[in-house]
């Protein structure tokens, strides 16, 4: 919204700053962090009163988790307030990429909120029907992908199929045109990302820091892919308008820092599905917009590992009646092996940093 102040730059040189994505990204980070810091205590207090017993703890989980009973959930509301409030101030709301990303973020956040609500009111770890939840998520994601695909298509040359194509790291000219099936592919990527972060969110601070790391990596990718000069230099695909997504990702980092202040062990609040689904969906949407869906598998590799551990566990148990891991997702497996919660969290953070660096290295390896 404040980008409109650029029109005053002819009269006041200061307002020229609002033209620069880098300035607005930094401002968005600061603003979202401030929003969470200021309103976080009141939100936590309100949720604690309204929820009573707080988030239910899995009966088959590690014994150390039972001391967390009574901790309120739905902390994603704080994160969403920071992201959306900051985005409304600093992002270009005329950008279809910004609007699509906010649509997915708020849509997935609403689904997560309802899921959290059911879990708290029923005092059960069984919330929203899995199939219904995935179906609604996919519809929201598909709508966003369709509009982003059309935007990328119209920005290309006449007859271009770029908007509906999947690109590959290491190979600049290799593209696979999926046509309208790209909507299905992009929807799968976004829904997968949302639920992968959701599965990772099982320990204090475990999900939010890798989310911030992935956001920083994709903020850089969005800025570079949206800049013709940098995109040409790095030989990555130029996607006009996606640079604006760096502002949104700056807001994610700021909101994440604010949330981590309250989520640091012992957590005063949990993110809940409200936050994890929204944040994962946001990252997935940016990956689709910037044409870096495959690179997201590397940058968000920690989330992929967590998801695969659940898939393997369920598949193998149904097939043989035995478990591959002591408990899934895999972070609980290591807790059962004797790792302390802080050991699991910090070591997984390290893995997230390494994977983000590997993912970013693909930008130059062509």
UniProtKB/Swiss-Prot annotation:
Record-level Gene Ontology MF annotations: metal ion binding; phospho-N-acetylmuramoyl-pentapeptide-transferase activity; UDP-N-acetylmuramoyl-L-alanyl-D-glutamyl-meso-2,6-diaminopimelyl-D-alanyl-D-alanine:undecaprenyl-phosphate transferase activity
Keyword Cell inner membrane: yes
Cellular location(s): Cell inner membrane
Broadest EC class assigned to this enzyme: transferase
Signal peptide start-end: none
Record's keyword annotation contains Amino-acid biosynthesis: no
One matching Pfam family: MraY_sig1
Cofactor: Mg(2+)
Enzyme Commission code(s) on record: 2.7.8.13
Topological category with respect to the lipid bilayer: Multi-pass membrane protein
Example of a GO cellular component annotation carried by this entry: plasma membrane
Primary location recorded for the protein, binned into one broad class: membrane
Biological-process GO terms, alphabetical: cell division; cell wall organization; peptidoglycan biosynthetic process; regulation of cell shape
Catalytic activity entry: UDP-N-acetyl-alpha-D-muramoyl-L-alanyl-gamma-D-glutamyl-meso-2,6-diaminopimeloyl-D-alanyl-D-alanine + di-trans,octa-cis-undecaprenyl phosphate = di-trans,octa-cis-undecaprenyl diphospho-N-acetyl-alpha-D-muramoyl-L-alanyl-D-glutamyl-meso-2,6-diaminopimeloyl-D-alanyl-D-alanine + UMP
Keywords for the protein's UniProt record, in alphabetical order: Cell cycle, Cell division, Cell inner membrane, Cell membrane, Cell shape, Cell wall biogenesis/degradation, Magnesium, Membrane, Metal-binding, Peptidoglycan synthesis, Transferase, Transmembrane, Transmembrane helix
CDD domains (alphabetical): GT_MraY
Residue stretches spanning the membrane: 27-47, 71-91, 93-113, 134-154, 174-194, 205-225, 245-265, 268-288, 297-317, 343-363
Superkingdom of the organism of origin: Bacteria
Pathway the protein contributes to: Cell wall biogenesis; peptidoglycan biosynthesis
Function noted in UniProt: Catalyzes the initial step of the lipid cycle reactions in the biosynthesis of the cell wall peptidoglycan: transfers peptidoglycan precursor phospho-MurNAc-pentapeptide from UDP-MurNAc-pentapeptide onto the lipid carrier undecaprenyl phosphate, yielding undecaprenyl-pyrophosphoryl-MurNAc-pentapeptide, known as lipid I.
Record family assignment: Belongs to the glycosyltransferase 4 family. MraY subfamily.
Protein name, entry field: Phospho-N-acetylmuramoyl-pentapeptide-transferase
Protein species of origin: Sinorhizobium fredii (strain NBRC 101917 / NGR234)
Lineage start: Bacteria, Pseudomonadati, Pseudomonadota, Alphaproteobacteria, Hyphomicrobiales
């Amino acid at each position: 919204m404040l980008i409109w102040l650029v029109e005053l730059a002819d009269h006041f040189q200061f307002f020229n700053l609002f033209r620069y994505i880098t300035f607005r990204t930094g401002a968005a980070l600061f603003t979202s962090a401030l929003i969470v810091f200021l309103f976080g205590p009141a939100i936590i207090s309100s949720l604690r009163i309204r929820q009573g017993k707080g988030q239910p703890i899995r009966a088959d989980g590690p014994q150390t988790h039972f001391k967390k009973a009574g901790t309120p959930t739905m902390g994603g509301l704080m994160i969403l307030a920071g992201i959306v409030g900051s985005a409304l101030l600093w992002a270009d709301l005329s950008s279809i990429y910004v609007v699509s990303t906010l649509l997915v973020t708020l849509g997935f956040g609403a689904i997560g909120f309802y899921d959290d609500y059911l879990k708290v009111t029923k005092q059960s770890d069984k919330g929203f029907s899995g199939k219904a939840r995935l179906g609604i998520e996919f519809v929201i994601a598909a709508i966003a992908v369709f509009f982003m695909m059309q935007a990328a298509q119209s920005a290309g040359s006449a007859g271009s199929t770029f908007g509906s194509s999947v690109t590959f790291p290491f190979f600049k000219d290799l593209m696979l045109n999926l046509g309208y099936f790209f909507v299905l592919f992009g929807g799968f990527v976004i829904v997968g990302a949302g639920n992968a972060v959701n599965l990772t969110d099982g320990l204090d601070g475990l999900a939010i820091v890798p989310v911030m790391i992935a956001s920083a990596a994709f903020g850089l990718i969005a800025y570079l892919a949206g800049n013709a000069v940098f995109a040409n230099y790095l030989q990555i695909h130029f996607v006009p308008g996606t640079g604006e997504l760096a502002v949104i990702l700056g807001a994610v980092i700021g909101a994440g820092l604010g949330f981590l202040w309250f989520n640091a062990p012992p957590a005063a609040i949990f993110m809940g599905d409200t936050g994890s689904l929204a944040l994962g969906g946001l990252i997935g949407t940016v990956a689709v917009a910037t044409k870096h869906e495959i690179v997201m598998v590397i940058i968000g590799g920690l989330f992929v590992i967590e998801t695969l551990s659940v898939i393997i566990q369920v598949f193998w148990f149904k097939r043989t009646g035995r478990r591959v891991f002591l408990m899934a997702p895999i972070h609980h497996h290591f807790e059962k092996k004797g790792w302390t919660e802080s050991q699991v969290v910090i070591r997984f953070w390290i893995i997230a940093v390494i994977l983000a660096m590997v993912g970013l290295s693909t930008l130059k390896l062509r």
